[in-house]
From Swiss-Prot:
The lineage of its organism: Bacteria, Pseudomonadati, Pseudomonadota, Gammaproteobacteria, Alteromonadales. The gene is pdxH. Homodimer. Binds 1 FMN per subunit. It is an enzyme of class 1 (oxidoreductase). This is Pyridoxine/pyridoxamine 5'-phosphate oxidase. Its EC number is 1.4.3.5. It comes from Shewanella woodyi (strain ATCC 51908 / MS32). Pathway: Cofactor metabolism; pyridoxal 5'-phosphate salvage; pyridoxal 5'-phosphate from pyridoxamine 5'-phosphate: step 1/1; Cofactor metabolism; pyridoxal 5'-phosphate salvage; pyridoxal 5'-phosphate from pyridoxine 5'-phosphate: step 1/1. It catalyses: pyridoxamine 5'-phosphate + O2 + H2O = pyridoxal 5'-phosphate + H2O2 + NH4(+); pyridoxine 5'-phosphate + O2 = pyridoxal 5'-phosphate + H2O2. Its cofactor is FMN. Substrate binds at residues 8-11, 67, 124, 128, 132, 192-194. Catalyzes the oxidation of either pyridoxine 5'-phosphate (PNP) or pyridoxamine 5'-phosphate (PMP) into pyridoxal 5'-phosphate (PLP). GO terms for molecular function: FMN binding; pyridoxamine phosphate oxidase activity. One of its GO terms (biological process) is pyridoxine biosynthetic process. Belongs to the pyridoxamine 5'-phosphate oxidase family.
């Protein structure tokens, strides 16, 4: 087996030019997301890492799924009693990362997370499969449990409880809109001369800068 330090690869799938960039970053993100979804190389194109910090400044990361995006920002849903939600309540500044390795691309976002309204959350919740709706009631996310059987038992209880009719929205389940202050697009380049462009949100629009790799 080779050493990790011996692993090499070339990046040659594409490039990124300043004169081809739109004025608004979400236009480029939409294009890249569409290409990621159409690619057979990515199994979870909507998977993104979200980083938060606790009260001591310790950062944490985890993977969540992007459920929609617009000029306003990026939306995901989660348990409101989870560690990430508690940290967002303390410090709303977060960062997101879409690691589209097989396309030799990544998108890094900084911004602030804003809680969605109950109506907005409900609109999404009712579209989820019933099994997923029930699962939202089962897990006290980030709490310590003795065994997986604890979850299985609770799921069976909730499944029986909600066997008839609709599953109500848990009060502890919600979502966030991450309003971006910066969005960086990275495209792998030959000889490690990668293309990086940073969109910084200003008072009159977005400023675009090329960054050294």
């Amino acid at each position: 087996m080779s050493k990790l330090s011996d692993i090499r690869r070339e990046y040659s799938l594409g490039d990124l030019h300043r004169d081809a960039l739109p004025d608004e970053p979400m236009s480029l993100f939409s294009k890249w997301m569409e290409e990621a979804r159409d690619s057979e190389l990515l199994s979870d194109p909507t998977a993104m890492s979200i980083a938060t910090v606790d009260e001591s400044g310790q950062p944490f990361q985890r993977i969540v799924l992007l459920k929609r995006f617009s000029e306003e920002g990026f939306v995901f849903f989660t348990n409101l009693e989870s560690r990430k939600s508690q940290q967002i309540a303390h410090n709303a500044k977060v960062s997101l990362l879409f690691p589209w390795h097989s396309l030799e691309r990544q998108v890094a976002i900084t911004g602030e997370a804003e809680a969605l309204s109950t109506a907005d959350v409900m609109k999404y919740f009712i579209t989820r499969p019933k099994e997923s709706q029930i699962a939202a009631w089962v897990s006290q996310q980030s709490s310590k449990i003795s065994a997986r059987q604890v979850l299985e038992t609770k799921y069976a209880e909730m499944k029986a409880k909600f066997s008839k009719g609709e599953v109500p929205l848990p009060k502890f389940w919600g979502g966030y809109l991450v309003k971006p202050s910066s969005i960086e697009f990275w495209q792998g380049g030959e000889r490690r001369l990668h293309d990086r462009f940073l969109y910084d949100k200003g008072q009159s629009g977005w400023d675009i800068s090329r960054l050294a790799p």
